Amino acid sequence: MVTLSILVPRNLEKEVLNMLGIVLAGGQSKRFGRDKAQVQLPGQPLNNVGLAVTKLQLLCEQVIVSANQQNMANLTEQFRTSSNVIVVTDQVPFERQGPLSGIFAATNYSPELTDYLLLAVDYPLITTTILTTLVTQTDCYATTPTQDHYLVSHVRTSQAMVRAHLLLGDLRVSHFIKTTCQGLPVTFPDSQAFTNLNNMEALTNAK
């Protein structure tokens, strides 16, 4: 696997050892037209899920990839030789309920209160500098002057907390991050790093 490099400050070493990463790769990609997780952008060394996993591996002791039924087999094969990567899919009774389904499935690996660094495959250009900034703060999410980015976040949560939120019938990840996790915004300048691959136009602009 191609690796990316980053210098991790000494004062982050404890967080690196105690934090789990979650890569959200289970979206249906309806607007995009094909599975965003497996798309490889021109000039990038890996596909989008590979980029996300590699970045989180630099900051987390274990990375959990939340897949869907369609890409589960391919992603499992992609990370078959990665000892610190686990691929999971939605669990009953919360299948196909958006990002929170993926977060619920991922928290099954460590159900107790745990630090998680979240990154969706929608953000292939996000930098490790941005992620490192989030790691230095607890319960936070990235925001820019024009948009909030709840799937680029660092939260402390448990499977019980995710379950309780889902049982309320509220599937908005924004409410989960801000209300259940009491996440606060960390503001970054607008930049290409926050390009969200929601459609083919975004893919063209990211090239």
Could you describe each region identified by the protein language model?
Residues 6-18:
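Short, Lys/Arg-enriched N-terminal segments with co-localized hydrophobic residues
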Residues 2-4:
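Extreme N-terminal basic, low-complexity initiation segments
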Residues 203-206:
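Short amphipathic alpha-helices within nucleic acid-binding modules
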Residues 17-150, 157-159, 164-170, 180-194, ...:
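Nucleotide and nucleotide-moiety/phosphate-recognizing core
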